[in-house]
């Protein structure tokens, strides 16, 4: 069971980081398709996308609590995240405005992930592939930073980072596609 959860986590992580990098890269150009009133909303998308990524990883770890019939641990870790979110919103909103909400959301989901990653080790020893996880996180955060701070030639750098994330995770995404297509082929 540990091997199964570790493999699924690795594949899931690969897919999520590739999607996240792609969404971050495309968020600003896609805003041109909307009315001018919505263009400025692009600045909220990058951090909310990473927050959503960590929420997805949290839900994966939540499945371990459910399998092991330890749902109260899920409640405790989510409560810690909720308290952190409230405190961080109180701290960030006066200083950085609406971007404080997105930053607080990201940091809160990251906290929940870290708590669950440590906490679930006592229930099921998953290999989180920490080097892969940290590398993906650094690459996507660099992409977000370049875009939000509008560094010179940010579009080129963000494109290169997205290609890098996708190349780094290619085997994982390909493995997931093979499994999905293999199952679909057997059903037909």
What are these regions (language model features)?
Residues 1-78:
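Specific pore-lining/lateral-gate transmembrane helices of multi-pass inner-membrane transport
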Residues 16, 79-85, 133-145:
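Hydrophobic membrane-spanning alpha-helices of multi-pass integral membrane proteins
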Residues 20-28, 86, 90-91, 113-121, ...:
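Membrane-embedded alpha-helical segments of multi-pass transporters/permeases
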Residues 32-33, 67, 94, 121-122, ...:
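Transmembrane helix-loop junction
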Residues 42, 72, 78-114, 146-161:
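Membrane-interface helix-loop junctions in multi-pass transport and translocation proteins
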Residues 49-59, 105-118:
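Hydrophobic, membrane-facing alpha-helical anchors
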Residues 61-69, 117-130:
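Alpha-helical transmembrane segments
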Residues 126, 145-188:
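Membrane-proximal transmembrane or re-entrant/amphipathic helices at the cytosolic face
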